[in-house]
Design a protein with these regions (language model features):
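Active-site-proximal cofactor/substrate-binding loop regions of enzyme domains
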Residues: 52-54, 72-73, 99-100
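SAM cofactor-binding core of SAM-dependent methyltransferases
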Residues: 3-58
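Class I S-adenosyl-L-methionine
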Residues: 59-67, 77-160
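Solvent-exposed polar/charged
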Residues: 43, 72, 104-105
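Active-site glycine-rich loops that stabilize anionic/oxyanionic intermediates
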Residues: 12, 74-75
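Flexible loop residues that form catalytic
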Residues: 33-35, 75, 116
């Protein structure tokens, strides 16, 4: 039986590529606001029958099928050293809370999220702490008894 997943902030499908290479995963839907990334995603993957949302803030929870795993690389510009590092003062910096909104209702067994190293040290670590300890996150992680592991990896996959 396949593990069903929802691909948030899908980009061109990095998470999906890895999951499909492993095998045993089935995508039930995806979310990507960039039209060119969406075109590439749809050119590379058979998305027929999958639910699509362009904007994470407009995801209608009642329309989402059940899934076991939510994967996503929520937007990093607000935390990256290459950007202005505005954190939660930039709307893009608040999109993690859309993940929390979805997970609170859909209750997948697993979350697999990625972001830039700057998320860990933005605002002296307070941003990452807020994400982990916000009321939504505490309710979500406490209720589901998720264990949280964060790891800083290089592009080659080795720990730093």
């Amino acid at each position: 039986m396949a593990i069903r997943f929802f691909d948030m902030f899908a980009g061109i499908g990095g998470f999906r590529s890895g999951l499909e290479a492993i095998g045993g995963f089935e995508c039930v839907g995806y979310c990507e606001i960039d039209k060119y990334a969406k075109q590439a995603y749809e050119a590379m993957y058979d998305t027929g029958g999958e639910l699509y949302f362009d904007d994470a803030r407009k995801i209608v929870l009642e329309q989402l099928p059940d899934f076991d795993l939510l994967v996503g690389g929520f937007l990093c510009q607000s935390f990256s050293i290459a950007g202005a590092r505005k954190g939660f003062d930039d709307t893009r910096g608040t999109l993690f809370f859309e993940i929390a909104r979805i997970v609170a209702v859909k209750k997948p067994k697993y979350l697999f999220l990625e972001n830039v190293p700057g998320l860990l040290n933005h605002d002296s670590g307070k941003t990452f702490e807020t994400i982990l300890l916000s009321p939504k996150s505490c309710k979500l992680f406490g209720e589901r008894r998720h264990s949280i592991a964060d790891e800083l990896l290089t592009a080659c996959g080795r720990n730093e």
